[in-house]
Amino acid sequence: MAKRGVSRREFIKATGAGALATGLGANIIVPGRAHAAKKTLKILQWVHFVPAYDEWFNKKYIKEWGEKNDTEVTVDNIGIAGLSARAAGEISAQKGHDLFLYNWPPPTVEEQTVDMKDVVQECERKFGKPIDLAIKSTYNPKTKKYFAFSPSFTPDPVNYRQDLFGQVGMPKGPASWDDVRQGGAKIKKQFGNPVGIGLAQEIDTAMAMRTIMYAHGSHEQDPDGNLTLDSKQTLEAIKFVKALFEETMTPEVFTWDASSNNRAMIAGKISVALNAISITRTAEKQDPEISKKIQLTKALKGPVRAIGLEHVMDCYVIWKFAENIEGAKKFLIDYVSNFRTAFLAGEFYDFPCYQKTVPDLAKLIANDPKAHPPDKYKVLEDVLNWATNVGYPGYSNAAIDEIYNTWVLNVMFAKAASGAASPEEALSEAEAACKRIFGKWKDKGLV
């Protein structure tokens, strides 16, 4: 996606503003002349990458829930690139939606959100403990607060062209990052299809670069939230990405947005992409022939481990200034209770953070009549063994969030890959930026 014109941090400077005064006149009810106003619940979330999900959620689910709970529920959908600015605007005005969905952990807005501890506890009572990925993405161990609630996440498998990799001796696709480098170079040379991993200021690049870092044993922080970016392992990851770009890719990746790899893969232009199953689902509908050629594999092995990130972490927040806090909490608990329906409506895009809500998940993804072949999505059955959170091996804290949303690591890798800076220079610049960011949030007491 394009670089945001105004960062979340810049907007948050305005959060000291008090709640807007509300006139009383509209709330006066004359006995015998009017009924109590119907409750309302206002939700904002992204335009889902699987349109069938929005069709179900917007036109069916919220209406049914509203009728059962005597509440008028409305939902506003905006593109993922606009979420941060919209959230910052609501915080600045101290007015907006009751439920706001981020597609990544949002710890920088913790001071503006309601603690979700009771929602987590109720869902845990009903469905057992949430997955560790959900806790690491929504809980602050420093303040002991759940600043958000995550009902689901999206796996981030490797999408690859099976026909092309088969012709360079890898019929089951790449199993390691070195396979991508070697196989990708051969494919580009023989067939002209480059590797399609972004090096731009957008979310897919942010996830892919961290995946490569973590596989190399490099991390932004340690388990206790101490900065650890400046390491031999990070330098090796940067050098690897530089070589990967030079040997397998094309300069267009420097200007990609979050959907560029989707479009390029479906158009038959690239050999590999790291993305959710939105690529394969779209291909099934738009081009069944290319769909048969695109297959999935698990997280790739690096020098240290095989690991991948979540592609989307669904994190709902309830603002402290929300008008229907209790209704918003009940909506989330009920949504988790109905998550199997959501899982099916989203065509397996969103996986449950409470695993008992979809007890037959493995069976469902192992035999999908829409897929080519029907067991294409079976590869995701053990996703929790290789998927992790932004900020691994620590929590997704406020410093990690700011580093993520200001594209510090994206820029680090892009500068080195393009030759704008040496790997050492790019790392030094990123380390300096991260030190400032960690220092700021430690001073605020949130890290």
Predicted features by range, described:
Residues R4, E10-P31:
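N-terminal export signals
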Residues K39, K63-I131, D163-A175, A264, ...:
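Extracytoplasmic "Venus flytrap"/periplasmic binding protein-like
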Residues L41-N58, T154, D204, Y395-D401:
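Extracytoplasmic "Venus flytrap"
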Residues V50-E72, L409:
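Short, polar/charged alpha-helical segment
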Residues Y102-P157, T211, K293-L300, K376-V383:
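Hinge/lid segment of periplasmic solute-binding proteins
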Residues K142-P151, D156, R181-L227, Q233, ...:
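Extracytoplasmic/periplasmic solute-binding protein
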Residues G183-K186, D224-F254, A299:
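Glycine-centered hinge/linker elements that transmit conformational signals in sensory
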Residues S278-S291, G302-W407, G445-L446:
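C-terminal lobe and pocket-closing loops
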